[in-house]
Amino acid sequence: MSGYMISPEYYFIYWFLKYYLSPMIANASPVLVKGIHRIDFSHIFIDGKPLFGKNKTWEGFYVGVLMGFLTSIGIGIILCEEEYILIGLGSSIFALIGDLLGSFIKRRMNIASGEPLPIIDQLDFALMATLYYYFLGIEEFISYPLYILYSLIIILALHIITNNIAYYLGVKDKRW
């Protein structure tokens, strides 16, 4: 934990922002660019379907990594925890890999690019970021399983709300 004393009633907010803000920003950022270079290079998987689909581009991935990294720099500076900067970068990359994994699963299920798959669409990135923290064995993270559960519920709700806002603002073509 940082050098600051945080009262118990605010600790969850601190914890949530520290561990999930960078992955959330990374996951939300690719929509800011209209990429043309597909991550799957238009390759077809052995089942005859695209690996990820037309909406997963290198430009979006790079913007996601950059925005997640910038967020982790901010968090690291605010919390006086420089080591968090690399941890946040890693969680951002894992979040984007989680999003790709979700797209891979959707293609296997014959769900077209841009079409919804509830729960997977909202939580794939957060589950991969969670797995990343477990891989690293970050005690402050893994010691709070209820915080993880609460966080996933909050992320699910936030994802639905922010996607609807982005749709109504014209940033996204679909509400999901």
From Swiss-Prot:
Catalyzes the formation of CDP-2,3-bis-(O-geranylgeranyl)-sn-glycerol (CDP-archaeol) from 2,3-bis-(O-geranylgeranyl)-sn-glycerol 1-phosphate (DGGGP) and CTP. This reaction is the third ether-bond-formation step in the biosynthesis of archaeal membrane lipids. The chain crosses the membrane at residues 12-32, 60-80, 85-105, 118-138, 141-161. The keyword Protein transport does not apply. Its cofactor is Mg(2+). Keywords: Cell membrane, Lipid biosynthesis, Lipid metabolism, Magnesium, Membrane, Phospholipid biosynthesis, Phospholipid metabolism, Transferase, Transmembrane, Transmembrane helix. Its EC number is 2.7.7.67. It is a multi-pass membrane protein. Pfam families: CarS-like. GO terms for molecular function: CDP-2,3-bis-(O-geranylgeranyl)-sn-glycerol synthase activity. This is CDP-archaeol synthase. Belongs to the CDP-archaeol synthase family. GO terms for cellular component: plasma membrane. One of its GO terms (biological process) is glycerophospholipid biosynthetic process. Its main location: membrane. It catalyses: 2,3-bis-O-(geranylgeranyl)-sn-glycerol 1-phosphate + CTP + H(+) = CDP-2,3-bis-O-(geranylgeranyl)-sn-glycerol + diphosphate. It is found in: Cell membrane. Pathway: Membrane lipid metabolism; glycerophospholipid metabolism.
